């Protein structure tokens, strides 16, 4: 139970969850774009970002786009056309079709399915990595055997059980779209995330492991797909002497100015990952003895990028906490705490934490969408049926988990104070 009388000293400057870390070369590349007047969506910076993405991630083709969401959208369009054929103008490539997707993720993973008229089917999470559960995915194919597309995200920079998941996807003749927006630089059995799917995405949003303030990249080994994305992202203009359009296009290309920032960030990817890992290890050591554990990882097979350090409170150490759609309340209890209390305590010293992603099947906009757990339809179970166990894994992690300040500019002294605040919540 956190007491206001603890009087922890506030940080003069806010300690952020994860903010951009600049090094110097970024501004030089931005100046280069300005001084050469390459300020639009073509230029050397863009070319270099695409080259560096292929080099660092290990794919054959990269297309720099305005956001990771843009890449996911065009990935869904590609996958939909491959699976179901070209739609008529005004109709999405996934119209009326189900798409399996990660449940515990940010909505940017899921929304592109809906952009193309598809119906997301949410697959429950597993406790080992907090990612899509292969057993639940297999069950989903039993229930909806005609589904041809699966979207998988790697939560907070930790690779999921991608080999097992991919084997299931291939067995059922489906297409994997990989969302590596949070996991750039992470590897599974030595292979970079962002290369396991046929169509893949990384993000350069302001809070990511490297950033351009915005932006993302479409990654693939399929040259034809890369060319199609490049065309669609520039309004699908045909190679004619006039403005001619035979397909629906989008204004999704990355600015050469933004690309200058991304270009300057790429050489620091490994350094940023090392800093994030040190933060994770300091939390892990500092929180020993508390009834909490850090976000889990399969270190035998994968190397995360440690983007965000998270914790989950032991069930018996949870005080009473009730969340509505936008409000929350909890009851302080000696020796116990909850995510809300810890987040409030962290905020009181001018540091930023956040709740775990609220699972998509719990979101009001998607509350009527199918949700699959290990034993079948997660929407169809009665209270009596679930009385003896967890309602679903994602809901449980959301209830007990939170993201800790993970900024790679945070000092050891600042982190030690945050750890002391967390300890005080369990007094």
Put a short name on every predicted segment.
Residues 1-39, 405:
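N-terminal "arm"/small-domain region of PLP-dependent enzymes with the aminotransferase-like
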Residues 104-110:
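Conserved coil-to-alpha-helix start sites within the AMP-binding
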Residues 47-52, 56-62, 135, 139, ...:
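PLP-dependent aminotransferase class I/II
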Residues 117:
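Structured binding elements
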Residues 42-98, 112-114, 122-124, 191:
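Phosphate-binding glycine-rich loop
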């Amino acid at each position: 139970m956190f007491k206001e009388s603890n009087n922890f000293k506030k940080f003069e400057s806010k300690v952020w969850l994860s903010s951009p870390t600049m090094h110097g070369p970024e501004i030089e590349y931005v100046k280069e774009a300005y001084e050469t007047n390459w300020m639009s969506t073509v230029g050397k910076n863009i070319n270099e970002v695409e080259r560096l993405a292929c080099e660092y991630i290990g794919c054959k083709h990269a297309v720099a786009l305005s956001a990771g969401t843009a890449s996911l959208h065009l990935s869904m369009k590609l996958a939909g056309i491959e699976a179901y054929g070209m739609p008529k103008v005004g109709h999405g490539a996934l119209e009326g079709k189900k798409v399996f997707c990660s449940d515990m993720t940010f909505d940017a993973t899921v929304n592109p399915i809906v952009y193309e008229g598809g119906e997301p089917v949410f697959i429950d999470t597993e406790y080992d990595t907090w990612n899509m559960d292969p057993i639940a995915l297999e069950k989903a194919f039993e229930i909806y055997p005609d589904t041809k597309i699966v979207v998988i995200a790697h939560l907070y920079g930790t690779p999921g059980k991608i080999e097992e998941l991919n084997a299931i996807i291939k067995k059922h003749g489906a297409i994997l779209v990989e969302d590596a927006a949070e996991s750039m630089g992470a590897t599974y059995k030595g292979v970079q995330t962002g290369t396991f799917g046929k169509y893949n995405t990384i993000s350069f949003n302001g809070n990511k492991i490297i950033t351009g303030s915005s932006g993302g990249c479409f990654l693939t080994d399929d040259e034809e797909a890369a060319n199609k994305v490049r065309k669609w992202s520039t309004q699908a203009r045909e190679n004619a002497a006039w403005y001619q359009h035979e397909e629906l296009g989008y204004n999704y290309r990355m600015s050469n100015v933004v690309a200058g920032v991304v270009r300057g960030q790429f050489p620091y990817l490994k350094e940023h990952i090392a800093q994030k890992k040190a933060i994770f290890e300091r939390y892990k050591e500092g929180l020993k003895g508390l009834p909490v554990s850090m976000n889990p990882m399969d270190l035998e097979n994968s190397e995360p990028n440690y983007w965000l350090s998270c914790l989950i409170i032991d069930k018996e150490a949870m005080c009473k906490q009730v969340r509505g759609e936008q409000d929350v309340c909890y009851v302080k209890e000696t020796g116990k705490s909850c995510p809300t209390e810890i987040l409030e305590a962290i905020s009181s010293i001018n540091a930023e934490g956040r709740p775990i992603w609220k699972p998509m099947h719990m979101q009001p906009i998607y509350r009527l969408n199918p949700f699959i757990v290990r034993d079948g339809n997660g929407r169809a179970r009665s209270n009596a049926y679930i009385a003896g166990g967890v309602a679903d894994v994602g809901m449980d992690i959301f209830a007990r988990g939170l993201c800790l300040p993970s900024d790679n500019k945070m000092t050891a002294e600042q982190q030690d104070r945050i750890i002391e605040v967390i300890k005080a919540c369990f007094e």
